[in-house]
Amino acid sequence: MYSLIVEDDFISRKILQKILLQFGECDIATNGLEAIKAFKLAWVQSRPYDLICMDIMMPVIDGQAALQEIRQLEKDFGLRSDEVVTVIMTTALNDKKEVVDAFYKGEAASYFVKPFEVAELVKELKVLRLLDED
């Protein structure tokens, strides 16, 4: 699994990286603009991400806006809905508007409120078919 972690908080970023490195390679972005650039570069190199874990509240471009831009790029690339990257949004806020925006505007696959348990994330990766069942 090839993942992109988009997180401005160092500790949160390191925790996600430690979890996801067990399952494959991870790239890091610290804001939404870097995420968009990393997403484009991965496609240019014919090595698209399988998963993006993206924080919502970040500097430069927030996670919601970055996700909408990534979804637009996927449309521009002519991707079908079954070819788009799986995105898990993460946030410290349990805000209903943010949840709705993540799912309906950004078509996120899942949404986690920090802090969350490692087992929860691994279970969700299996549900999303990014990891094999045991």
Task: Describe every region a protein language model picked out.
Residues 7:
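Conserved acidic carboxylate
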Residues 10, 21, 28-41, 63-66:
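Helix N-cap/capping motif at the beta->alpha junctions
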Residues 37, 41, 64-83:
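Short amphipathic alpha-helix used as the core "switch/output" element in two-component signaling
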Residues 43-53:
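Active-site beta3 strand of CheY-like receiver
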Residues 58:
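Receiver (REC) domain active-site loop signature in two-component systems and cognate sites
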Residues 65, 77, 82-83, 94-110, ...:
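Alpha4 helix (beta4-alpha4-beta5 surface) of REC/receiver domains from two-component response regulators
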Residues 113-114:
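A Lys-centered signature of the CheY-like receiver
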